[in-house]
Amino acid sequence: MKNMFQKCMSAFVAAAFFVSTMGTSFAATPETVQAKLDLCETDTYGQPQTGAIMERINKLEKDYDGTHRTGSMMARTNAIYDSMYTNTATPSILAELNGIEWTIRHEVSATPVQERVTDMETELSGKTSEGTYTKRIRALADFAFGANQLPIEQTSVAANTLVKVALAEEVTSKNVKKGDTVHFTVADDVIVDGRLIFAKGEPGTAVVEKVQQARNFGRNAKLELTDYKVKSMDGTIVDAYVGEEAKEEMKQYAMAAGASLAGIVILGPIGIIGGAFVKGKDIDLPAGTEMYIETTGDTMLYGVTTTLAK
């Protein structure tokens, strides 16, 4: 019986993995003043702000720097954007904030800067502080690390680095359509060479490529996802896909969970998921369903130095 199951499993795995779509396109960097302001404001306040463009630029500059920059509208917007997102000579503001939050909570949230800073101040000292976000973040870093500079260093992250993720919402073959975005979060920390690269709680997305409803004659529903993207600790959007290593991890995961042959789901590029989430012939994956993806290519990312094992 065991041998028969293994033979059936091998055949099933071969069938389940015949489709594996790789997401290779990078998320487009906003180019216009409006688009960059929208993104900066969303990550700072929770949503884009209203009002004249110059008023919005002035507000961001005041909240982060306490002063106004000089130069053109585009130059000032670029300066704000770069300080928040660009990791070149030094880590970005969001990279530093992620590092602080992970050190305090061992998890990173997707809430806006103003909420994250306020929550951590209250958690650590019982009250909120005054001043710019930059000043308050430096103070949090000093409390968390004993210095206002975080132990963050650049690290080479190889292609095919595995990342365990969990669905942030229910996904079923009945409630999604082609082109929909599926949201997930990093389920476990990923540490490379002693540095935290992907922190638990970081967000990610995939796109529904194909949905096929359950049909007559015992034909089960199918769901294919593509264009996986996951945010690293330093805020970089990293392309990912379901490659051979991710498939093998999910195969072992499903078998370790005792998934039966009849209950394992074919989920297109996602691969094999535990059978406990299948209801009849439809695909029904609740929020929290875990799976594996892997990075598409080699990349340089900032990571927080940690003594935790990988």
Feature locations, PLM:
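Bacterial N-terminal signal peptides that target proteins for export
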Residues: 2-12
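Sec-dependent N-terminal signal peptides of Gram-negative outer-membrane/periplasmic proteins
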Residues: 2-3, 26-29
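C-terminal segment of classical bacterial N-terminal signal peptides
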Residues: 17-26
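Alpha-helical, heptad-rich or low-complexity scaffold/stalk segments
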Residues: 28-141
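N-terminal targeting leaders of membrane proteins
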Residues: 138-156
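Contiguous beta-sheet cores, especially beta-hairpins with glycine/small-residue-rich turns
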Residues: 150-266, 272-310
